[in-house]
Amino acid sequence: MTVVGDVAPIPRRNSSTCSNDIAAPLLPECHGDEVAHDEFNGASFSGAVFNLATTIIGAGIMALPATMKILGLGLGITMIVVMAFLTDASIEFLLRFSKAGKNRSYGGLMGGSFGNPGRILLQVAVLVNNIGVLIVYMIIIGDVLAGKTEDGIHHFGVLEGWFGHHWWNGRAAILLITTLGVFAPLACFKRIDSLKFTSALSVALAVVFLIITAGISIMKLISGGVAMPRLLPDVTDLTSFWNLFTVVPVLVTAFICHYNVHSIQNELEDPSQIRPVVRSALMLCSSVYIMTSIFGFLLFGDDTLDDVLANFDTDLGIPFGSILNDAVRVSYALHLMLVFPIVFYPLRINIDGLLFPSARSLSTSNVRFGCLTAGLISVIFLGANFIPSIWDAFQFTGATAAVCLGFIFPASIILKDRHDKATNRDTTLAIFMIVLAVLSNAIAIYSDAYALFKKNAPRE
């Protein structure tokens, strides 16, 4: 997503004229110039779908089977489908009003509707959300590959289990190697389309996890080792009723990808294809989410943990169970490594917009580009390694920033209706989105605060 200023639509590639008011960083000032320099003819449809799908499928996929445990398969799958439709509607709001206002960025659209404060608010939300997400990704990668010690109990990482404890497979060493060997090179691309192959591999790794989970579930189902799952929630008292709402934040934030939509559209060979791209990505991710939820819950039932990855740290009770456990954990760690650059891309753009709002395109300054990239990666690395309470902090700020990006900001643009384009249906849907987002955020903050106080309360 680009956020600095509004820009005129890019002319057709064969045109000899260029717009002079393009100020969005990392966007070519003229497609003709861009082609002349490096033969970039626009992003493909499939590449755009994979980039958007990778933006969506991050760490949240592992929390979905636990939502089935609370909601039951029938209601849980219905909620996933509903959230996919709401996400599609909110992105459609952004694209329709961007076209009306001739904006080619989310920030430009917010600036057009709410002035400079709106643009800055959007940039801060992306900053908080994406830094938090990337630090959490790095923490998870460290936990999976190097292990962790919690409450005096050491949980072995995959590499530690394979090779024993050595300096090179310790947490700090693994994260340093990953940062220098994977994150830094992938973060150096100036176009989001350059990440299409790593994004495709990232989606493929998520599918590998799904295939392994499905295979184990089917094997155990045939052998009679799996009970039929509940289709509806088990509500027996008021506490179990209120417990249903604790999964709302997980579902509401499951499809957040809005901060990358404009960047992907701007690089498309045919920008009008962005709506089919969005719908294809949402259909792909919905299918992966639904199948993961079904087979994850089918496999572990009421023993499904909040993070189903933790269930693969136990004995599966099947031949080659330990090998399959390691395959799931390694594929997931590799998946997160490849998600990292697609989430990092809009983070760098927004930091540049906050620090240098009137500067030329970030792609024209290698020094600024390099310094921002190195600085942000360093902050994320240090946060994941040396700030033990940072996960708790981002549980609060992350929930707030994510629902703002996905629902509150798009709905607010509709309610502002600067171009008189909103219908009664749009207004009703926008109000519903805001109510849902506020409810989700309140539940998430209450649940996280309650869990934190309970965790830190002195034991009797």
Swiss-Prot record:
Q: Disulfide connectivity?
A: none
Record's InterPro entries?
A: AA_transpt_TM
Q: Which UniProt keywords apply?
A: Amino-acid transport, Membrane, Transmembrane, Transmembrane helix, Transport
Q: Chief location of this protein? A: membrane
Q: Which domain of life is it from?
A: Eukaryota
Cellular component, GO, one term? organelle membrane
Pfam families from the xrefs? Answer: Aa_trans
Q: Which residues cross the membrane?
A: 45-65, 66-86, 120-140, 172-192, 199-219, 238-258, 281-301, 336-356, 371-391, 394-414, 427-447
* UniProt-listed GO biological process terms: amino acid transport
Which compartments is it annotated to reside in?
A: Membrane
Topologically, how does it sit relative to the membrane? Multi-pass membrane protein
Entry's family note: Belongs to the amino acid/polyamine transporter 2 family. Amino acid/auxin permease (AAAP) (TC 2.A.18.6) subfamily.
Give the protein's recorded name: Amino acid transporter AVT6A
**Species:** Arabidopsis thaliana
